[in-house]
């Protein structure tokens, strides 16, 4: 039992700390998502492990021969888990309990605020996205958000932008990326949609025909 007022760990460390394959995967995730250390990977993995454990218990209850599937408390628990994961965009709206077992750590890391700031085109790199957040330049629904690891719901994702008095609100700011991903309230275009459109326009055309063969000597 922890002391009152003392924060307990919200994650589990690996049981076998020196597994080469797992360590290599963790390093890749730290680099890809601009994480501060492996602890942030372990937090995401622990969260995923918790949901998968609950999903297995529910599936085991169904497999135990209960007629009519999930009922009562089990049905309510199943709906709550699915509703939360759908709300945060971790699974699709038509997903079921079985789909939770196929989730990966990356599915959790993709919903972090730091990742979403990069995906929406508000920062050039994932490291810059973290810097903008910790320095108070990013807001959700107009409220400053300074925690890079907070999970962002699909609804809040549409309202991520620069904080009200941040210098980055100025489009000529040297650290601000080229803004083609601005939220257009009148047309309903989101930052994400605009960013995806920009990526499609900048995709280089495929070269056809291959390399031309040189003719033989005469």
Curated annotation (Swiss-Prot):
Listed SMART domains: Ribosomal_S4, S4
Key words of the record: Ribonucleoprotein, Ribosomal protein, RNA-binding, rRNA-binding
Gene3D superfamilies the UniProt entry points to: RNA-binding S4 domain (3.10.290.10)
The keyword Transcription regulation belongs to this UniProt entry's keyword annotation: no
S4 RNA-binding domain segment(s): 111-175
Family: Belongs to the universal ribosomal protein uS4 family.
Protein name: Small ribosomal subunit protein uS4
The organism of origin for this protein: Methanosarcina acetivorans (strain ATCC 35395 / DSM 2834 / JCM 12185 / C2A)
